[in-house]
Amino acid sequence: MERMRRARNAVLVFYYVFTACGAVFCLRRDAAVYNLLLALAAFALPAVPFLLYRACRLRPVYLLEIVFDGFVLAAVPFASLFGGYDFVPYWDKILHFLSGFLFAVLGTAVYFSCKPGRRLERGDAFNAALYTWMFAMMSAVLWEIWEYFVSQFGADPQHVLTTGVGDTMQDMIVCTLGGLITAVSCWKYLRHLGEKRRKGLMMSLFEAYYSENIEKRP
């Protein structure tokens, strides 16, 4: 636990140094209000896990924070402030693909939080994996609905003018694929519960959250 806490702190230091450099780079290039808001959002987003801990009375899960900060770093400071979308091919699709993994793990946590007794059992393998996959797909759809809502105010986050529905469909497909891979990992994890097998990052993330905030919950 202490080692993970130190690792989380090191990641946060790197995140804020990287973000500060990205903010300076972005605002010197174009000091538009939109870019200023992006920079402020980049500095604020690492606080999301802490706010969730307080609001939901959860125990800290440092691995969760490390993974979350890594994803946000790739999505906002690197992609938006430094312009990663412009010089890394398919970076947007890579991020949507990775989001499928994260939303799927969240789905696994929701499944066992709602399950009576909240115990991990081999018999849950199929249902939990299916729920995990469906949760990731639902999240992809909701995100595209949000982007459509934003587009009503003049922006074009779905690139409708240049791709039609292509960008929207590709985003949902790659997120669904990431969710499917995590669902298979969830199925294997539960089918071989108790055996000494490699869990992979996503199931390790779920296990860390489960042990702190589901299993120990009264």
Regions found by a protein language model. Name each.
Residues 1-14:
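N-terminal membrane topogenic signal
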Residues 2-3, 31-33, 51-64, 118-124:
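Membrane-interface helix-boundary motifs at transmembrane edges
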Residues 27-33, 58, 81-91:
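Membrane-interface helix caps and helix-loop-helix hairpins in membrane proteins
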Residues 37-40, 59-71, 93-96:
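Cytoplasmic-side transmembrane-helix entry/capping segments in multi-pass membrane proteins
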Residues 46-50, 71-76, 104, 135-143, ...:
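Alpha-helical transmembrane segments of multi-pass membrane proteins
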Residues 82-83, 87-92, 137-180:
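Interfacial helix-loop-helix junctions of multi-pass membrane proteins
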Residues 99-115, 152-157, 176-189:
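Membrane-interfacial alpha-helical segments at the cytosolic side of multi-pass membrane proteins
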Residues 193-218:
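Short, highly charged, low-complexity non-transmembrane loops/tails of multi-pass membrane proteins
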